[in-house]
Amino acid sequence: SSTETPPSYNQLNYNENLLRFFNSKPVTAPVPVELDPPKVESSYVSSAREDARSTLSPVQGFEGSGGSGSSGNFTTGSNLHMSSVTNTSNAGTGTSGTGNSGDGGGGGAGDGPGSGAVPPVTLTESLLNKHNDEMEKFMLKNDRESRGWSGEKNKKSANDTLKMVEYSGPGPGHGHGIKRGGSHSWEGEANKPKQQLTLNAGGMPPLVDIHASSSSLSKCQTSVAGGGGGGGAGSASGTCGTGNNGAGGGGGSNAQSSTNQYTQSGLSCTQNINLWPPFSVGITTPTSVLSTHMAVAQSSFSPQHSLFPTFYYIPASIAASSPASGTSPNPRPHKHTHVHPSSEQPSTSQGAAATMPLQYMTGVMYPHPSLFYTHPAAAAATAMV
């Protein structure tokens, strides 16, 4: 990024330093104090160098050494001064630089690029610092240009990405794409409360708010009017949503036929249960008890397509009707024992469990019939009533 500190000169010049160092074929062995050439060469070359050093002139001795170091006949001061230059220069140019520097005392002979006509420049600290400053400016300029080019490339790619996003945005042809869970849909259904059945700590489903389904209640009351009145109410509440055989005359037969159709058809029974309001069961009259049961039966024949999460279950008619028929064989007291406690206790969970069928989780289709059992609490409430 542009905010970071610029790299130092050593970092920028690292690769060039490595390349220049290995091109100079440096002497990696420890150099003795008298600056003799290293003894890693062959015996023939070393003996020839010793002979040349003892017999030849300084220039010729430098030629015989192959340009790999300064001559042994130089003074100690010149050797110390020129060691850095000769060790970092091109090592193979010693032979071409001979014969031109015999009068200079051998100082810097053979150090040039091969021409020998240009006099060697004496390296000083100020000259090296000046060279370093110039090279640092040059390297920083190259680094800035390279980073600027990469920054422009990144900016161009970012602009292309933004254009692609704009082109592929929600248009007339892109109305329905992949919708993730929890995202706002275009139909405005982002924050609607979900409606489903949840089991409480006792294993029973929450009590149903009867006043929330007024339309289904009105349908049920019209169907109950032709059914025979209070007799059907006794049979419906006593059998936990399945109906007794002929209990209460005409009303009982009506409830029996409707629940038998509901049991045989197995259609989806959807109930609009809101999770947010507190639980309230407003059972006041036997008519409301009957209409609550009939709402479950009638809603199966009038499917409500507006509610999406539906649940499928088969009521266990045998398990629910056996304890009720065992405790009250006479149908006439059977009617009275069910109508009055339900009206006397309008808000108890036992009465609601006795009048409401057991329901399971929404959106889940239970495939095996053994899963559809009557909860022990519901069976106990039915037996107690």
Swiss-Prot record:
InterPro entries: Period_circadian_regulator
Extent of Polar residues compositional bias: 340-351
GO molecular function terms listed in the Swiss-Prot or TrEMBL record: transcription cis-regulatory region binding; transcription corepressor binding
Composition bias, Low complexity: 71-93
Gene Ontology BP term (one): circadian regulation of gene expression
Annotated region (Disordered), positions in chain: 28-121, 169-189, 322-351
Post-translational modification: Phosphorylated with a circadian rhythmicity, probably by the double-time protein (dbt). Phosphorylation could be implicated in the stability of per monomer and in the formation of heterodimer per-tim.
Keyword Cell inner membrane: no
Composition skew (Gly residues), residue ranges: 94-115
Domain of life: Eukaryota
Endpoints of the signal sequence: none
Disulfide bond residue pairs: none
Keywords linked to the UniProt accession: Biological rhythms, Cytoplasm, Nucleus, Phosphoprotein, Repeat
Any single GO CC term annotated in Swiss-Prot or TrEMBL for this entry: nucleus
Compartments (UniProt record): Nucleus; Cytoplasm, Perinuclear region
Function of the molecule: Essential for biological clock functions. Determines the period length of circadian and ultradian rhythms; an increase in PER dosage leads to shortened circadian rhythms and a decrease leads to lengthened circadian rhythms. Essential for the circadian rhythmicity of locomotor activity, eclosion behavior, and for the rhythmic component of the male courtship song that originates in the thoracic nervous system. The biological cycle depends on the rhythmic formation and nuclear localization of the TIM-PER complex. Light induces the degradation of TIM, which promotes elimination of PER.
Subunit field text: Forms a heterodimer with timeless (TIM); the complex then translocates into the nucleus.
PANTHER family: PERIOD CIRCADIAN PROTEIN
Entry protein name: Period circadian protein
Natural source organism: Drosophila nebulosa (Fruit fly)
Taxonomy of the source species: Eukaryota, Metazoa, Ecdysozoa, Arthropoda, Hexapoda
